[in-house]
C-alpha cells in the first residue's frame, strides 16, 4: 500500500512530471488496470511477442546476446513501438502513419511514395503508444488538444535513423506520422541520382557557377533534399565556406555549417539569412523559399557574389520563374540571379519478378511520343502481373524508385524571355528547343527502357 502522507515522494513525482500531484483513494485492482493500460498493456505484450517471433523467423536473430537481453527487459509498449519502426525500415518505408479509427488503430507505411496498410490493432494501444512516442520525441505528454512536433533517433540493424514526428488531434484520438531518414542516405554520388548523361552535364555546368541561384522544385517526397545535399557534397571543399539554413536539418554533413530554424526564438529563414551574410559565406543553402522576404534575400545574395541553392514547390521548371515573380521579385532581378532550375519527381521501378514486356498499342505509342510513321514498328513496354507471394515486392508490383528530371539551364534567350515578363509556356517552349527534356519526356524514356510503367507515369507526371 502507498503512503498518502509521504511528502518526499510526492515532491519527487511533481519535479519529474512537472505537474501538481493530487491524492486520490482507489483500489489495488484499479491501479493495476491503469498500469496495464498505460505501461504494460497485455495487448501490447501479445503483439510485441508476435513481432519478435516473426522477426526471428524472417530475418534470424541478428542481435547479440546483450541486445536481446535488453530488449526482453523493455516494457511491452516500448518493444512494440521499436518493432513497428524496425519493420518499417525493413520494408523501405519513408513515413509511418498511426491512425485512430472508431474502434481500431490502423498503421500504414508509405513505401515508394504509396501508402500501404501494414497492420491493425485494438484502439486501447493508442494512448500508450502516443505517450511513449511523445516522451522519446521530446513533446509534452500532457498536451492532447494541440498539434505537436518532435524528433527522435533509433538504431536499426546498426544504422542510425533520424525520425521526425508530427502529432495531430483527431476526433478518435491523436494521429501520429513518423518520417524516417537514414542519416547517411541523403548525400550520394551525383551519378546515382538517375540523371541521363546530358542531364548530368547540365547539372555539373550549373554547379560550376561562382554565383547565382539554383532552384530545385517538386512536391513533398520528390527527392529535392537528396538533390540539394548531393550538390552541397559536390561543392564541399577546403576552399569554400558553406552555410545552410534548414527547417529541420535533415542530415549532418562534415565540413558544412548548418543552421536550424527556430521560429519561437525569432530565428526564421529570413533572420538567419541576414546573419549568414555577415559570416563571409561562399555558398548558401536555403532549405525552402517560403515567402517573399526570404526570396528577396536569396536573390540579392545571388546577385552580390554568392552561390545559392534552394527549393520551391512548383509543378515544373518554367513555372518556378512565375512563382518568384508572384513573390514580388522583379523580372530583371530573376533574370540576373537564376542560373538553373531542376524540377523532379520519383517514379516507382517495376518489380523485375512481376514484370512482363508486352507490345504497346497505338494509343500508348502516341503517349510515349513515338512519331505516327513509326507506329508500325513493335515497341515493348512493361506491364505488371502482381504476385502476392513475390519476395521482391510483396505483391505491390514495384520495388524502389528512380528520379526523373526537367533541367532548365539558363541561356541568353531564356534570360531575355524572363526579363521581358514572358510566360511559363514561352519559357518551356524555348527550353525544349535548347534541349531540355520535360518531366513527361524523361518519364517516357524510363518506360521505353523497361524501368517503369505508363500507369506510373500517369500517377506521377501526368499533370505536366
Explain the meaning of each model-derived region.
Residues 120-127, 193-197, 266, 314-318, ...:
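Short, conserved loop/turn and helix-capping segments at secondary-structure boundaries
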Residues 90-91, 157, 278-279, 304, ...:
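Charged, alpha-helical scaffolding/interaction elements associated with membrane systems
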Residues 200, 204-215, 225-349:
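Switch/coupling sub-region of P-loop NTPases
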Residues 314-411:
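Cys/His-rich Zn2+-binding cysteine-cluster or related metal-binding knuckle/ribbon modules and their
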Residues 1-44, 53-222, 438, 445-464:
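N-terminal "pre-motor" subdomain/linker immediately upstream of P-loop NTPase catalytic cores
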Residues 12, 16, 34-37, 132, ...:
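Alpha-helical scaffold elements adjacent to nucleotide-binding pockets in ATP/GTP-utilizing enzyme cores
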Residues 373-464:
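NTP-binding/hydrolysis catalytic cores, primarily Walker-type P-loop NTPases
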Amino acid at each position: 500500500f502507498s503512503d498518502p502522507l509521504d511528502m518526499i515522494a510526492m515532491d519527487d513525482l511533481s519535479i519529474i512530471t512537472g505537474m501538481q500531484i493530487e491524492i486520490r483513494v482507489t483500489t489495488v485492482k484499479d491501479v493495476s488496470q491503469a498500469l496495464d493500460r498505460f505501461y504494460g498493456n497485455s495487448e501490447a505484450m501479445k503483439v510485441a511477442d508476435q513481432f519478435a517471433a516473426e522477426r526471428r523467423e524472417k530475418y534470424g536473430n541478428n542481435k547479440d546476446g546483450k541486445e536481446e537481453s535488453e530488449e526482453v527487459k523493455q516494457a511491452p509498449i516500448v518493444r512494440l513501438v521499436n518493432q513497428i519502426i524496425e519493420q518499417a525500415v525493413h520494408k523501405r518505408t519513408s513515413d509511418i502513419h498511426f491512425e485512430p479509427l472508431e474502434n481500431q488503430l490502423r498503421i500504414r507505411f508509405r513505401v515508394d511514395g504509396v501508402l500501404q496498410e501494414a497492420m491493425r490493432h485494438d484502439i486501447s494501444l493508442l494512448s500508450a503508444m502516443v505517450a511513449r512516442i511523445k516522451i522519446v520525441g521530446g513533446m509534452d505528454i500532457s498536451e492532447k488538444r494541440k498539434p505537436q512536433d518532435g524528433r527522435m533517433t533509433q538504431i536499426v540493424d546498426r544504422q542510425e535513423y533520424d525520425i521526425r514526428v508530427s502529432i495531430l488531434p483527431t476526433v478518435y484520438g491523436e494521429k501520429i506520422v513518423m518520417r524516417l531518414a537514414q542519416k547517411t542516405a541523403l548525400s550520394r554520388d551525383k551519378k546515382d541520382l538517375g540523371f541521363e548523361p546530358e542531364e548530368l552535364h547540365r547539372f555539373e555546368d550549373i554547379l560550376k557557377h561562382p554565383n547565382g541561384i539554383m532552384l530545385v522544385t517538386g512536391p513533398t517526397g520528390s527527392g529535392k533534399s537528396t538533390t540539394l545535399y548531393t550538390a552541397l557534397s559536390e561543392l564541399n571543399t577546403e576552399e569554400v565556406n558553406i552555410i545552410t539554413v534548414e527547417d529541420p536539418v535533415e542530415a549532418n554533413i562534415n565540413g558544412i555549417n548548418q543552421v536550424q530554424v527556430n521560429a519561437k526564438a525569432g530565428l526564421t529563414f529570413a533572420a538567419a539569412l541576414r546573419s549568414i551574410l555577415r559570416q563571409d559565406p561562399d555558398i548558401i543553402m536555403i532549405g525552402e523559399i517560403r515567402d517573399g522576404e526570404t526570396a528577396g534575400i536569396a536573390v540579392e545574395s545571388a546577385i552580390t557574389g554568392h552561390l545559392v541553392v534552394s527549393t520551391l514547390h512548383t509543378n515544373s521548371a518554367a513555372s518556378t520563374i512565375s512563382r518568384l515573380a508572384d513573390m514580388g521579385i522583379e523580372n530583371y532581378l530573376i533574370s540576373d540571379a537564376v542560373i538553373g532550375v531542376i524540377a523532379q519527381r520519383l517514379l516507382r521501378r517495376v518489380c523485375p519478378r512481376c514484370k512482363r514486356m508486352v507490345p504497346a498499342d497505338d494509343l500508348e505509342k502516341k503517349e510515349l511520343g513515338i512519331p505516327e510513321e513509326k507506329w508500325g514498328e513493335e515497341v515493348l513496354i512493361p506491364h505488371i502481373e502482381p504476385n502476392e507471394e513475390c519476395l521482391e515486392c510483396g505483391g505491390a508490383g514495384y520495388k524502389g524508385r528512380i528520379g526523373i528530371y526537367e533541367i532548365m539551364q539558363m541561356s541568353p534567350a531564356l534570360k531575355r524571355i524572363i526579363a521581358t515578363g514572358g510566360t511559363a509556356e514561352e519559357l518551356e517552349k524555348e527550353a525544349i528547343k535548347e534541349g531540355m527534356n520535360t518531366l513527361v519526356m524523361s518519364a517516357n524514356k524510363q518506360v521505353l527502357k523497361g524501368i517503369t510503367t505508363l500507369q506510373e507515369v500517369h500517377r506521377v507526371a501526368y499533370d505536366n
